[in-house]
Amino acid sequence: MPRRPPFWLTLLIILIGLPLCLPFLYVILRATEVGLTRSVELLFRPRMAELLSNTMLLMVCVTIGAISLGTFCAFLLERYRFFGKAFFEVAMTLPLCIPAFVSGFTWISLTFRVEVFWGTIGIMTLSSFPLAYLPVSAILKRLDRSLEEVSLSLGKSPVYTFWYAISPQLKPAIGSSILLIALHMLVEFGAVSILNYQTFTTAIFQEYEMSFNNSTAALLSAVLMAICILIVFGEIFFRGKQTLYHSGKGVTRPYLVKTLSFGKQCLTFGFFSSIFILSIGVPVIMLIYWLIVGTSLESAGDFSEFLSAFSNSFIISGLGALLTVMCALPLVWAAVRYRSYLTIWIDRLPYLLHAVPGLVIALSLVYFSIHYANDLYQTFFVIIIAYFMLYLPMAQTTLRASLEQLSDQIEKVGQSLGRNPFYIFRTLTLPAILPGVAAAFALVFLNLMKELTATLLLTSNDIKTLSIAVWEHTSDAQYAAATPYALMLVLFSGIPVFLLKKYAFK
C-alpha cells in the first residue's frame, strides 16, 4: 500500500483534526494571559508539587492495577475451566455499567474510610480494569498456540514462554489500554472530587468555580498536556512495529482450555467473587439501600423529570457516539494503512486532547461559540462536539485493534483490480471490521451516558441528564434522591456492555 493517502482522505482527516485544535488554542491564549512572573510563581509553589504528585500517583497506580487485574482475569478466564466461569466472563465486564462517581458516592455512603489515597486507588482500579480485560480477552481468544508449543518443546519454562511468546502478542491490547486508562486518570473529575482526592482536574474546577479564573485553569491544563505528550510517545514506543495478523498458510490453532483442580477452582472462584462483590455488589446494594431507607427520595422529582433526564441522556449520547465513530474511522484507517508523519500525528492528536480536562474543553467551546457562533451556545450541537472531542481516542483504540488484526492483502487484491481506495474500504474493509465498529459505538455510547464534567458546563438549566441529576443530588448529600437516576444509569449501561461482550470482543 502507498505511504501517502489519497487526496480526499488527507483532506478529510485534516478537516476532522481542525476542530480538535480549538482547545489547544484556547489553553495557549488564556495561559499566556497569566504572564511569565505569575506563571513561574504558580508552577513552582508547593501546592503545584502536591497536585503533580497526587495526579501522577493516581495515574500510575490505577493504570498498573487495572492493567494487571484485567490481564490476569482475562488469562484465567480464557485458559482455564472452573465452576462459575460462564458467569464471571460476563461479570468482569459489568463494572463498566457503574460510573466511577456513582461507585465513589456509594462507597462514601458506606464508610468514610475510603477517603484516603488507597481507597481512591482501589475504587478507580475496580472501575477501570474492564478496559484492559475486554481487549486482552479478545486477543487471547484468537492466539495461535503454535508459538507456545514451540517454546515449551525447547525446554523453556511456562513463565519464560508467557513473557517472550505470549505477552508480545498482547502488546497492542495492553498498549492501547495503558494509553486509555492513563489519560483517563489524568482528567478524572467526578469520582476523585467525591472522594476528596485533590488532583490537577479538581484544582482546575476550583479555580473556575471559586474565582472564575480561566487563565490559571488554562495554565494547569498546559501542565497536563505536557504529561500527555510524554505518555503518547511512550505508548508509540511500547507498541513498536509488528505484524499482528496471521499471514501464513493454514488455520490458527486455538488453545486448549485446561480444567483446574478442585482446590485451585475454589481459590479462583473466591478471587473472582471478591472482585465482583467489591466492584458490583457494594455499589448496587448501597443504591438499593438508599432507595429503600433514604429520607430524601421525594427530592428526586416526578416521573416526567426522570423521563426527561433519561431521554436527554439517550439522544445526546447516541448522536455523540455516532459522530465520534464516523470521525474515528478515517483517522484510524489512514494511520494504519497509510503510515506517514501526517496521518500518525493527526491520529495521535485526539490522545493529546484527551489530557485536557473536560471542563477546559467545555470552556473553549463556550468561548468560541459565544464569540463566533452565539446561536449555538448551550445547544445540543455544542455538547455533541464536546463529546466528539472527549471520546474520539476511545473509538480509535477499539477500531485500531480490529483493523490491525485484518491483513491488508485483501485490500491489495482490490487495488490490483483497479478499484479506488474508498470502494475497497466500503466493500471489503468496513464489513470485515463491523464488530469493531459496533464495539467502538457501544463503548463510546456507554461512556457518554456517564459523562459529567463537560455536560455540567455546556447544558442550559432546563436540560438535565442522568449523570447531572446524580451529581446535583449527591453534592447535597441526598443519596436517596440520586438513587433512581443512578440505578437507571447502571441498568441502561448494561445494554452496550452486553453488546460489547457478546458481539464485539469475541
Curated annotation (Swiss-Prot):
Lineage of source species: Bacteria, Pseudomonadati, Pseudomonadota, Gammaproteobacteria, Pasteurellales
PROSITE patterns in UniProt: ABC_TM1
Protein name: Fe(3+)-transport system permease protein FbpB 2
Family: Belongs to the binding-protein-dependent transport system permease family. FbpB subfamily.
Transmembrane segments: 9-29, 57-77, 90-110, 116-136, 174-194, 218-238, 275-295, 314-334, 350-370, 379-399, 428-448, 480-500
CDD domains per record: TM_PBP2
Effect of V116G: In strain: TN106
All copies of domain ABC transmembrane type-1, residue ranges: 52-233, 310-500
Keyword terms, alphabetized: Cell inner membrane, Cell membrane, Ion transport, Iron, Iron transport, Membrane, Repeat, Transmembrane, Transmembrane helix, Transport
